[in-house]
């Protein structure tokens, strides 16, 4: 690709630590050098970094990872400042400033806050500042976490209007099987569509330490590709990997972006972490998947989670398979009350109504 590109580089815990209990500074120095080189060439670079808890554990001398959430958040609070200091220190060698963005799921599932985050990202990039993004582990609980930095990086790529998303890992890419216990495993070079067979392969493989395995990388690739962003999974240890991706050289596993990407609002719907989920019956599945219809309350069998009207929810069939993401017309309490009922009963049950559908087709993205 000619001209300036926007590249999001995601570095997981296994890449930043080399599988040890400490940050691998020599490796981080080399990756910063590669990113700075592309920044100097006119490209826009975004970093999505793990490692706050590892940095905190190293600084405080914890011999192993504590089990309690409070202790992990303590380490994240200590480590986050040291982590951003490290990124600033290393990029400053090349005369580059960084800007920290700490996000939680709440920043991304709310449309207005999502747009505010996008404006911040744009301002940083327009001023030639490298955004350094991480989940706000010091305050994030299970209920407000995105969950892993793979999916966070896909959302960051959407926020940045990126051309490419590079997921650096401790493997060469996505294999047909786990190469560490199957010598017949082969590297998958090109992916033009993510199907159930590929999901099954990724679900059985892991990527070093941290919360993100190959399954979460595949989820991230699905979100980003639907937004028109190419995704590359490659080894962080490969020399010149950042330049290779910018220049379009074959490296790792490349997931090709959809030729007709989703429009901006639907990118948010598909990428936003769901605030809850609903299970629907076979009739609703047929209406959504075969006829392209809205979801009516009659087809809802179960409602999980606590969500507000206007938040993104996941829609699943009776076997638990993901069907779609959509914006809920009713909050979770109201959805439970009207589930299984005909649309004309909504007003009588609730005393009000926001229309006959639970999720409108225009506010829905099929998985």
Swiss-Prot record:
Sorted UniProt keywords: Amino-acid biosynthesis, ATP-binding, Cytoplasm, Kinase, Nucleotide-binding, Proline biosynthesis, Transferase
InterPro entries with a match to the protein in the record: AceGlu_kinase-like_sf, Asp/Glu/Uridylate_kinase, G5K_ProB, Glu/AcGlu_kinase, Glu_5kinase, Glu_5kinase/COase_Synthase, Glutamate_5-kinase_CS, PUA
Domain PUA: 275-353
GO molecular function, one term: glutamate 5-kinase activity
Reactions that this protein is recorded to catalyse: L-glutamate + ATP = L-glutamyl 5-phosphate + ADP
Top-rank taxon: Bacteria
Pathway: Amino-acid biosynthesis; L-proline biosynthesis; L-glutamate 5-semialdehyde from L-glutamate: step 1/2
Top-level enzyme category: transferase
Location (main, coarse): cytoplasm
Entry binding sites for ATP: 10, 169-170, 211-217
GO cellular component terms, semicolon-separated: cytosol
Positions that bind substrate: 50, 137, 149
Disulfide bonds: none
Subcellular location, record wording: Cytoplasm
One BP annotation, GO: L-proline biosynthetic process
The EC number(s) this enzyme carries: 2.7.2.11
CDD domains hit by this protein: AAK_G5K_ProB (cd04242), PUA_G5K (cd21157)
SMART domains linked: PUA
Chloroplast as UniProt keyword: no
Family note: Belongs to the glutamate 5-kinase family.
Function as written in the Swiss-Prot or TrEMBL entry: Catalyzes the transfer of a phosphate group to glutamate to form L-glutamate 5-phosphate.
The protein's name in its UniProt record: Glutamate 5-kinase
Native source organism of the sequence: Serratia proteamaculans (strain 568)
